[in-house]
Amino acid sequence: MVVGGIVGWEEGQDDLFNPLSPRNRDDCLEPFRVLRAKAAERGIELHTLDVLEKTGITPQFNLYIESLPLIPINNCKNYLIRFETDLTVPINGDADYLNQFDGIFTWDTVLLSKNSENALNQKTASTPKFPLAYPNVLPAAFQLNQIVNLGFAGRDLFCVLIGSNRHANLPDARELYSERVKAIRWFEANAPGDFALFGNGWRVPQKRLGKSGKWRYRLEKVIPFLMGKAVFPSYRGAAKSKFAVLSKARFCICYENARDIPGYLTEKLFDALFAGCVPIYWGEPNIQEIVPSNCFIDFRQFVNRSNPYQDLYQYLSKMTEEDFIAYQEAGKQFLASPAFRPFSSEAFAQAILGPIQS
């Protein structure tokens, strides 16, 4: 029996594989349960590293699911799942850190390319890299080839945004954290009745980099407090279930944490499609080659206009129910097609286990 350790799940105690874990919102941990089950079929036993340490078992390999300092263990290979960009996790752009691993699983097509002139690619050329798409979990209420709340009926929320109030950790024009805030502020000022914000951390302003950013943060926090107003008036609290919220919404702003990074496609667009909600997407530069363009609204069509959110709002407001259903139908067809399979939990497990066993 081959034994592997999981490093980076702060709860430890195999909580990563527990469907009843309080962190398992919308069953987001399913990919790791599938990974464990598929590993067992291949004679591999997976546990979080703390469990192995308590039982005195030395793993043959460790799989890092967060970018943490490498733990040296004799005769143990180490693999990294590089989930985030270096804008959010700066160490993911550190060649010295990446080169410590025996292999890196990543969606980053630039890093995966053998002919890229990218500096990080060249500095890590000797480290094996394996393609891995961000996994997406089908909600329990989702049924293949069916659309929940077809059309406008049952969708009392016009437009929503679900996400945590975070910021980039490196200055970079590609970050979209601040663009989310622009969208929120526009709707709050111009169409407050047609917008709702969900997620964590929105009772305070968005944090910013640098000294001037810190002063701006303090002012944006203090002034609403003194005036007895909410920092973000559209905030409705955390979404206990994204599917429950999105199945009641017509549109959802689905911006990645950063744009124009090839391969960087996370759960945001898929969460909306599962719920029959039309995504307003910005992020992966080649998204139309991955997800059919009739499934979503590409915000790049509006971004260079003089008033992008006004034009977007007019487009959304004038959309007929027939056109809305066409978006829903296109999303349904994509999710039922082979094109979605690379983004499933099963594909995630197979993409990891193949290289580990080779």
Where is each model-derived feature located?
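Nucleotide-sugar donor-binding catalytic core of glycosyltransferases
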Residues: 1-295, 336, 341, 345-356
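Short, hydrophobic alpha-helical segments
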Residues: 316-320, 352-358
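Conserved donor-nucleotide binding/catalytic region of nucleotide-linked donor-dependent transferases
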Residues: 317-334
